[in-house]
Swiss-Prot record:
Inhibited by fructose 1,6-bisphosphate (FBP). This is Glycerol kinase. Sn-glycerol 3-phosphate binds at T13, R83, E84, Y135, D244. It is an enzyme of class 2 (transferase). GO terms for biological process: glycerol catabolic process; glycerol metabolic process; glycerol-3-phosphate metabolic process. The lineage of its organism: Bacteria, Pseudomonadati, Pseudomonadota, Betaproteobacteria, Burkholderiales. Disulfide bonds: none annotated. NCBIfam families: glycerol_kin, PRK00047.1. PROSITE patterns: FGGY_KINASES_1, FGGY_KINASES_2.
């Protein structure tokens, strides 16, 4: 197996990416292609499933050929993907019956409210670890069955297949032979019992979704099958699947209970490994399966923040405060603090642990002396404050004191933000050398399945530090800042509450 590589496919919300990794976990090649976002109505977000497939197949081939390699150089393929996004297709023709309904899509919000009014939230959470929300796949499937002509009849006849993006890619890579998913993607559908690790008959009945539509659920690291497409002439093992945040947790080597990662992207996704037992959240977090390797299943607590790096994009595109996103660090660093200014970026409501859909973006504490630099600093600080809210909820739910925070994603390159995050948290923020942790996690899962890497210890040893940010702010100062933030969040919620 000399000079073989692992190909990681990272199918994201705005682009399809492919990366080749060598035995040391280094990136050898990378290819990326963006695709169209479709907005048919306000609050609706769709993708073309055929474009998801064509862009992903295209970058897979490009990542391999641009290094002068071919399919025989690929030891295995690992897949990681945007989660919850829902595709339903005809088993006979292989054609989607409707566009992919993306995780951000809110069209089923009213239906979710009606399920909550029936008192079903506790039951759904107990079985799936998830709240009832249009974010997850179940109500999106139901919408397609109810609204696409002929879909329900075909589904009853066993002619339709449902899959999250991983299933759709495997189906196409195997020329319509394999209809599978892994436990992490299944655990985001609101149809999967995370305790029995099976599709839940009661929930399927409740939502009137035929079981015949659903993929077979597998571990996150095993040989599912081999490629049969013209993308690669050789048959390559498809050997790893995990949803993007789960793959990032694995790529960060958060493999023991209590380890936490934060991916700083457009939003923030925080995940804590809670070991082999699911913890039901009392603090508005989501309980999910982290991954499964062999018979070993790890669980996690997760909190999502809607607006993180997006607040910087807003300052650039919406307000014109900066010309490029990279400018924000220098501008924010030109003042020692925000001078009492707080920015609550609730542009789309507040995510975990607040889950307030009606809160709106607000700026507090503005005086005549407030400058562009203060606003820039308040925007960065808001990312760290929101992350701390989620981390505090994780500590409360798990009873575990966080020892360090492993960070990745685009905004983790911002040293000022990482330092403030460490200051607030009171523990080190730790940035790895390879911040492409999502793709790396998928590569590791695939490589472990075929013996490319011997065991978990071997890949754990590859994790390398780029920089460790140690807390340096006095405790009283942290408490004072946090009190101001909490006041600002309360005010942002009150603004949206028209009963006050």
């Amino acid at each position: 197996m000399q000079d073989q590589y692992i190909l990681a496919l990272d199918q994201g919300t705005t682009s399809s990416r492919a990366m080749l990794f060598d035995r040391q976990g280094n990136i050898v090649s990378i290819a990326q292609k963006e695709f169209e976002q479709i907005y048919p109505q306000p609050g609706w977000v769709e993708h073309d499933p055929q474009e998801i497939w064509s862009t992903q197949a295209g970058v897979a081939a490009e990542a391999v050929t641009r290094t002068g390699l071919n399919g025989t150089s690929i030891a295995a393929i690992g897949i990681t993907n945007q989660r919850e996004t829902t595709i339903v297709w005809d088993r006979e023709t292989g054609q989607p019956v409707y566009n992919a309904i993306v995780w951000q899509d809110r069209r089923t919000a009213d239906f979710c409210d009606s399920l909550k009014k029936q008192g079903l939230e506790a039951k759904v959470r107990a079985k799936t670890g998830l709240p009832i929300d249009s974010y997850f796949s179940a109500t999106k499937i139901r919408w397609i069955l109810d609204n696409v002509p002929g879909a329900r009849d075909k589904a009853r006849q066993g002619k339709l297949a449902f899959g999250t993006v991983d299933s759709w890619l495997v189906w196409n890579f195997t020329k319509h032979e394999l209809h599978v998913t892994d436990v992490t993607n299944a655990s985001r559908t609101m149809l999967f019992n995370i305790h029995t690790r099976e599709w839940d008959s009661e929930l399927l009945e409740l939502l009137d979704i035929p079981r015949s539509m659903l993929p077979e659920v597998k571990a996150s690291s095993e040989i599912y099958g081999h490629t049969k497409t013209t993308v690669f002439a050789s048959k390559i093992p498809l050997a790893g699947i995990a949803g993007d945040q789960h793959a990032a947790l694995f790529g960060q080597m958060c493999t023991t209970s209590g380890m936490v990662k934060n991916t700083y992207g457009t939003g923030c996704f925080l995940m804590m490994n809670t070991g082999d037992k699911p913890i039901e959240s009392k603090n508005n977090l989501v309980t999910t399966i982290a991954w499964q390797i062999g018979d070993d299943v790890q669980y996690a607590l997760e909190g999502s923040i809607f607006i993180a790096g997006a607040v910087v994009q807003w300052l650039r595109d919406g307000v014109g405060l900066i010309k490029t996103a990279a400018e924000i660090e220098a501008l924010a660093a030109s003042v020692p603090h925000t001078d009492g200014v707080y920015l609550v970026p609730a542009f789309a409501g507040l995510g975990a642990p607040h889950w307030n859909a009606r809160a709106r973006g607000s700026v507090f504490g503005v005086t005549r002396g407030t400058s562009a630099a203060h606003l820039a600093r308040a925007a960065l600080d808001a990312i760290a404050y929101q992350s701390l809210d989620v981390l505090a909820a994780m500590e409360a739910d798990s009873g575990i004191s966080i020892g360090e925070l492993r960070v990745d994603g685009g905004a983790s390159a911002n040293d000022l933000l990482m330092q403030f995050q460490a200051d607030l948290l009171g523990v080190d923020a730790v940035r790895p050398q390879i911040t492409e942790t999502t793709a790396l996690g998928a590569a590791y899962l695939a490589g472990l399945a075929i013996g490319y890497w011997k065991n978990l210890d071997e890949v754990r040893d590859q994790w390398q530090l780029d920089r460790r940010f140690a807390p340096s702010m006095p405790k009283e100062q942290v408490e004072q800042r946090m009190a101001g933030w909490q006041r600002a969040v309360r005010a942002a919620k009150a603004w949206a509450d028209d009963t006050q």
